[in-house]
From Swiss-Prot:
This is Adenosylmethionine-8-amino-7-oxononanoate aminotransferase. It catalyses: (8S)-8-amino-7-oxononanoate + S-adenosyl-L-methionine = S-adenosyl-4-methylsulfanyl-2-oxobutanoate + (7R,8S)-7,8-diammoniononanoate. The modification N6-(pyridoxal phosphate)lysine is found at residue 286. It comes from the Bacteria. Pyridoxal 5'-phosphate binds at residues 116-117, 257. The lineage of its organism: Bacteria, Bacillati, Bacillota, Bacilli, Bacillales. InterPro entries: Aminotrans_3 (IPR005814), Aminotrans_3_PPA_site (IPR049704), BioA (IPR005815), PyrdxlP-dep_Trfase (IPR015424), PyrdxlP-dep_Trfase_major (IPR015421), PyrdxlP-dep_Trfase_small (IPR015422). One of its GO terms (cellular component) is cytoplasm. Catalyzes the transfer of the alpha-amino group from S-adenosyl-L-methionine (SAM) to 7-keto-8-aminopelargonic acid (KAPA) to form 7,8-diaminopelargonic acid (DAPA). It is the only aminotransferase known to utilize SAM as an amino donor. Homodimer. Its cofactor is pyridoxal 5'-phosphate. One of its GO terms (biological process) is biotin biosynthetic process. Pathway: Cofactor biosynthesis; biotin biosynthesis; 7,8-diaminononanoate from 8-amino-7-oxononanoate (SAM route): step 1/1. Keywords: Aminotransferase, Biotin biosynthesis, Cytoplasm, Pyridoxal phosphate, S-adenosyl-L-methionine, Transferase.
Length: 452
């Protein structure tokens, strides 16, 4: 038994993988990644793969980036960690200042955590307590959130409560709190004749809910522009701005979950920037450290922050925090990550590669099994169907065979049900983007076009 075989045996014996049916996984030939460089991952057998899912939508400047490596090593020579509870540290202060500089101008305070789910959990608790701190009696019933159907905000209980993907969430229905779910503005599978008709109907319904149940609603949480985990649903232009207007009109806090779509993924630094939206609370994660280490942040306004201030420790205090909140190493690499965006003019690069990806993928719409191609920036989904008229989702077995065929030919991508997602390393070159699509196109041909 060679080294790779030994590792696979131990992996199967000891490791429980996330969002994975282990009964299936244990029977498959697992790929064990040993190292990475640039847009590529390398396994223990020496095979290399284009990272077409940015190691779960997080990698920015490529793997094994010398600049990010350098700042981590430099910080390690100073200190690895000290608590942010009752004291502070240099990297957490400098990163907070930078985050305030690059996010919407109304956001003035940064609360750190370690995962996107945690940043959402914090946002929910922050919004809920905000109303209680202002006037507990007047806002006694403000404990619900408007959410979008098919939304995904993480896997902790609060985040699941504001989610809307049955596959992930239905098993926990007895544990979660009630939310007010509204229709997602996703046109491809809607029953509307036009996007405008769909958007008008959904916004009208949202406004009616805000009028009728205003005393219950603490906030409106959504993934701005693109709903990721449900299959990359892209919202119509103007939807986010209209939601912001309604939230302001009816005095409801707007929470934008930018964990997946933030840091250039949609072509602008943040998805909110596309429509000049200023949320009351913004959640950040994933790409915040360039794909190196776990860090998240929940940003909010002075108005909300001030509601938590008191001269007495036990009054209005936000009792939330994690052991490694504001850790020096992760804050250091996050700060360097943001500096590299600016130094390398990454948003301009994404504008070019995004155009290439969009053109390459839209060319596939001629295929009889490609029902829809949707996305923005470097975040696209290809929905596979049995035929274009019925829009019946392609059998999952065939979709998974396409994904496996891509891996066999040197491309790591993943599917969300019948949607193949393309969320590559943000610094991926134009040539690599074309290679990624070419491998996928070949896989589609191998699985769907060849007669057995």
């Amino acid at each position: 038994m060679n080294y790779t075989q030994q590792l696979k045996q131990k992996d199967s014996e000891y490791v429980w993988h996330p969002f994975t049916q282990m009964g299936v996984y244990s029977k498959e030939e697992a790929i064990i990644i040993e190292k990475g460089k640039g847009s590529y991952l390398y396994d223990t057998n020496g095979n290399k793969y284009l990272d077409g899912y940015a190691s779960l939508w997080v990698n920015v400047h490529g793997h094994n980036n010398k600049y990010l490596n350098k700042v981590i090593k430099k910080q390690l020579n100073k200190i690895a960690h000290s608590t942010l509870l009752g004291s502070s540290n240099i990297p957490s202060i400098e990163l907070a200042e930078k985050l305030i500089e690059i996010t919407p101008s109304n956001l003035r305070k940064v609360f750190y955590s370690d995962t996107g789910s945690a940043s959402v959990e914090i946002a929910i608790k922050m919004a809920y307590q905000y109303w209680k701190n202002i006037d507990r009696e007047k806002y006694a019933k403000k404990n619900k959130f408007i959410t979008l159907n098919h939304g995904y905000h993480g896997d902790t209980i609060g985040a699941v409560s504001v989610g809307g993907i049955k596959t992930f969430h239905k098993i926990f229905k007895d544990l979660i709190f009630e939310n007010i779910q509204v229709e997602s503005p996703s046109f491809y599978r809607s029953n509307y004749d036009t996007e405008n008709e769909m958007m008008t109907a959904i916004l009208t319904n949202i406004e009616q809910i805000l009028i009728e149940r205003n005393d219950e609603i603490a906030g409106f949480i959504l993934e701005p522009l693109i709903q990721g985990a449900t299959g990359l649903f892209v919202h119509p232009k103007g939807f986010l701005k209209e939601v912001e207007k309604l939230c302001k009109k009816y005095d409801v806090l707007l929470i934008c979950d930018e964990v997946a779509v933030g840091f250039g993924r949609t072509g602008k630094m943040f998805a909110c920037n596309h429509e000049d939206v200023q949320p009351d609370i913004m959640c950040l994660g994933k790409a915040i450290t360039g794909g190196y280490l776990p860090l998240a942040a929940t940003l909010t306004s002075k108005k909300i922050y001030n509601a938590f201030l008191s001269d007495s420790h036990g009054v209005n205090t936000f009792f939330h925090g994690h052991t490694y909140t504001g850790n020096q190493i992760v804050c250091t690499v996050a700060l360097e990550n943001i500096r590299l965006y600016e130094k390398r003019k990454l948003l301009s690069h994404i504008e070019t590669t995004s155009s290439t990806l969009e053109k390459q993928l839209h060319a596939l719409k001629r295929h009889r099994n490609v029902g829809d191609v949707r996305g923005r920036g470097l975040m696209f989904g290809v929905e596979l169907v049995t035929d274009k008229d019925s829009k019946t989702p392609l059998e999952i077995e065939k979709v998974e065979r396409i994904v496996r065929n891509c891996k066999e030919n040197g491309l790591m991508i993943r599917n969300l049900e019948n949607v193949i997602t393309f969320v590559p390393v943000l610094s991926m070159s134009n040539k690599e983007v074309k290679t990624m699509v070419r491998i996928f196109k070949k896989a589609v041909h191998n699985i769907l076009d060849r007669k057995c």
